[in-house]
Amino acid sequence: MASHQDQASYRAGETKAHTEEKAGQVMGASKDKASEAKDRASEAAGHAAGKGQDTKEATKEKAQAAKERASETAQAAKDKTSSTSQAARDKAAESKDQTGGFLGEKTEQAKQKAAETAGAAKQKTAETAQYTKDSAIAGKDKTGSVLQQASEQVKSTVVGAKDAVMSTLGMTEDEAGTDDGANKDTSATAAATETTARDH
């Protein structure tokens, strides 16, 4: 009987040892899987953070490029307007001896129009640059259309200034010294003013 009891006790101990061993294996496998899942999650988080940083850098670079282009466009418009204004002054000085005070008055009007046009171009370019900066900060990628709009506005303004100056000087040069020429020149100045107003 004692032998039978010893045998049962031995089997119970053996079963307990097997159970503990299996439980240890299951626990070890669970720990390994948990560690592996943690590593994967950490790697995915790092990858996502890297992508976010890349996107932020790209947006920042695009915003900087847009700002530089807007600045270049503004400078080009300023240079063009300055050149047009200088040409008007040179032409006025050359023609003043032939046409007297009438041409001087018209030249002053042309200078004022050129200055107004330059101011409007500068203001429009500044507004466009501010809009570009705000859009970039908000993460919007509208740089291309904004730059195209700025370029068209500046071109339109510069062409308006040139047309106003050329119209004023051209009419004065063709019709210098006659009352009829003075009337035509006044009409041309009014038309140029209307064109410039529409461009604004």
From Swiss-Prot:
- Give the GO cellular component terms, alphabetically: nucleus
This protein's record includes keyword Phosphoprotein: no
Instruction: Indicate the family of this protein.
Output: Belongs to the LEA type 4 family.
Coiled-coil stretches, from where to where?
52-81
Protein name as it appears in the record? Late embryogenesis abundant protein 19
Ranges annotated as biased composition (Basic and acidic residues): 13-23, 30-42, 53-81, 88-97, 105-114
Q: Which UniProt keywords are present, listed alphabetically?
A: Coiled coil, Stress response
Q: What is the lineage of its organism?
A: Eukaryota, Viridiplantae, Streptophyta, Embryophyta, Tracheophyta
Show the segment(s) annotated as Disordered.
Answer: 1-145, 172-200
The induction annotation reads:
Induced by abscisic acid (ABA).
Q: Which residues fall in a compositionally biased region of kind Low complexity?
A: 115-130, 186-200
Function per UniProt: Involved in response to stress.
